[in-house]
Amino acid sequence: MTTSITLGMIGCGNIGSEFVDVLDERRAAIAATSGIDLRLTRIGVADLGKSRSPAVGSRVLTDDVGEVIDDDEIDIVVELAGDVDGVRDIVLRTLRSGKSVVTGNKALIALSGPELFAQARESGVDLLFEAATVAGVPILRPLRESLVGEEVTSIAGILNGTTNYVLS
């Protein structure tokens, strides 16, 4: 049995367009493997006139992010806007609306993480940010779920590409 999850997205620049392309290419495989059919239906953008990937064309684009947040059909909002100041408020509003948020925004988590996680807990939803860590390598979920019987006391190393670049 397949469960359908409807996604909304905030931001559709280079990374957002790639996300749409990969989702379209891998949607059937994801459904076959996980039993979850991911449908992206609405995308909030800053500039409706900007050129985007052809795959984006079948979605409803809006320059009013409230239309994404307030859409009752949307289960999860993917934040790929890349900004921090305006995005913080958007993510807070989304969490307050009872929707989980997935973000790859390192700066957002670094600057507003405690506030956002508190709001997610209060609203009973998830704020997922694994794409913002260790160059997107899935490490947080294995630490939290696969090693639940182990006591991980520390992780040492340079854990992101940005730091590697700055230090080299």
Which residues does each PLM region occupy?
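Conserved hydrophobic residues forming the short capping helix/wall of the S-adenosyl-L-methionine
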Residues: R27-A31, A120, L147
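N-terminal glycine-/serine-/threonine-rich beta1-alpha1-beta2 phosphate-ribose binding loop
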Residues: M1-S97
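General beta-strand structural signal in soluble alpha/beta enzymes
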Residues: L61-D63, D70, V78-E79, V102-G104, ...
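Rossmann-fold NAD(P)-binding glycine/threonine-rich loop
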Residues: A81-S97, G104-E145
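Short conserved micro-motifs on helix faces and helix-strand junctions that flank
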Residues: I10, L95, V102, G157-I158
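Charged, alpha-helix-enriched surfaces in structured cytosolic catalytic cores
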Residues: N14, V134, P138, E150, ...
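Conserved anion/nucleotide-ligand pocket segment
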Residues: E145-S168
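Glycine-rich beta-alpha junction loops
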Residues: G44-G49, T133-A135, I158-N164
